[in-house]
Amino acid sequence: MKKIAVLFSGTGSNLAYILEHLHNKELEVVVAITNRPEAGGIEFAKEYGIPLEIIDSTTFDKREEFDAELVHAIEYYKPDLTVLAGFMRILTPVFTDNIRAINLHPSLLPLHKGLYAIERSYEDENEVGGVSIHRVSSDLDGGKVILQKEVAKDGRDFESYESEVKRIEKIALVEGILSVLKEELILAK
């Protein structure tokens, strides 16, 4: 069974979705890692008995030092893939050159890279927004796009649009994980 590591910073709703829909079915979540000791997602990892690493990013003077510790933790668990699921850190080449990872981003990349992507997507002139799953690279939200899912604006208010983006991102994340792992199985044959 393929193994993944999941990185998160906040509520952990995407971690919970992965655990509910994939863990011990399609793959094994071998570790959940957060950079925030107060992150809500910690409870999901505990509930599922998943090994949990808390690496408080505020205790490091440099981003590279944090990333080195993160790489060390991930490598210990030997995942086939690392998944950034609401992990709110800009990663340096210390991470991106050593860890194979995908990221969930709440816009149709290359539009609206970085923070506040949902808000910026909602306010732009396009009729649709959406989510992207992409490979993690040293460029912020700049890695190869694996898949995208659109969300029509259709005169929705912001709360309705945001809710739909958050609903669809979980589905896209699961599809992206399975797609990458399946692609790697085919290439390995």
What residues fall within each predicted segment?
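Alpha-helical structural signal in soluble globular domains
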Residues: 17-24, 44, 48, 73, ...
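N-terminal Rossmann-like dinucleotide-binding module
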Residues: 1-40
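Donor/substrate-binding cores of folate-linked one-carbon enzymes
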Residues: 21, 81, 85-189
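Short, surface-exposed acidic-centric catalytic microdomains
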Residues: 25-65
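Glycine-rich phosphate-binding loop signature in dinucleotide/nucleotide-binding domains
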Residues: 73-79
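Short loop/turn motifs at secondary-structure junctions
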Residues: 26-28, 78, 127
